[in-house]
Amino acid sequence: MRVIIAGNKTDDTENIKKYLKEEGYNIVAEVSDGFDAIKVCRQHNPDVILMELEIPLLDGICVSKIINNEDIAGAVVFLLKDYNRYVIEKIKMVGARGCIFNPIDKNYIISTLEFARYTGKIYREIKKEKDNIEKKFEDRKVIDKAKGILMLNERLTEDEAYSKIRKYSMEKRVSMREIAEFIVISN
């Protein structure tokens, strides 16, 4: 697992680093501020970024929003000093996949990161599938609109209009949506 650690160098982060290395995890980068956290996530797209909530330049909440919006890390896990219901609600809202509290325990850290990676992977797969379905739906809307135009202007049946779009698509080696957009724009 590829991990980025973002936060101040403390005994806790050093212990975490030691535990992760003992388990064979690859610590891709260690950074001390929010700006660098985003920068290294963009470069390395880690499985997990383990981040303190309060880090310089951009706080963990802002960093998590950006990471999740840009999909540049599999999961965000926060390192928290202690339990605070308000903070937990905030980090849930920005898409964090977990949090680790003091005192630091090796098994707790490893299991939290493993679950975070797993749920992050599932989330990415579902999001990819959702995006694909949305794209197909949008394609279908444009193609249906183009079919309607062809049916009206050329007095074709729906099947004939679809076949015409498909034929042009194959001849020009472009997607049916591109042909459909051309038909819609040129009408």
PLM features: residue spans?
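C-terminal output/effector regions of signal-responsive regulators
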Residues: 131-187
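Acidic catalytic/metal-coordinating carboxylates
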Residues: 33, 59-62
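Short amphipathic alpha-helix used as the core "switch/output" element in two-component signaling
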Residues: 61-72
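Acidic, metal-coordinating helix/loop segments flanking the phosphotransfer/catalytic sites
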Residues: 32-48
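C-terminal output helix
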Residues: 104-113
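As written
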Residues: 46, 60, 91-97
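Two-component/phosphorelay signaling modules centered on CheY-like receiver
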Residues: 7-29
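Active-site residues of response regulator receiver
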Residues: 52-53
